[in-house]
Amino acid sequence: STPRLEGFSMPPEWAPHECTWMEFPPANKEFAADPAELAAARATWASVANTIARFEPVRMVCNLGESHISRELLDPAIELFETTTGDAWCRDSGPTFLTHPDGRLGATLWTFNAWGDRGFSDPTDERHVGVFIAGLAGAEVFPSSMVNEGGGIHVDGQGTVICTETVQLEIGRAHV
């Protein structure tokens, strides 16, 4: 079955939601080339998370064994969850949440290939993060064979989809 056939749809950005999900930057090729760069990335992520936490709950996924690092930088109200991670772009590799008129939560799990397997990070470390987050959120899971980055699509809740050409159509990135 598909989310649409089951009555689910992707809500617009401004729709009410329970919380914001984020991933804390792990040491990987993108962030850890220089310890100062990794520290700066972590401080930036923490600043964003701490700002969001002033207005709504934040749930942060941290790489296994690294929650103590994020805890030092994050507001105590931010919930931490540990699992193996490979990157910090939860919007791209995490679930795309869906809503149902009866209040149920769903999640599309795209096939994530780390931006076309360009070597920024190992996509195998990220592919389970969507399942992990969807499980914690209690969402009904809809796996998709479509290679996609969740951050590459936006909807208005009225049937309009805005997508990025580089994500959806770039050969190698989207395996078109």
Regions found by a protein language model. Name each.
Residues 1-173:
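The feature marks the mature, well-folded catalytic cores of soluble enzymes
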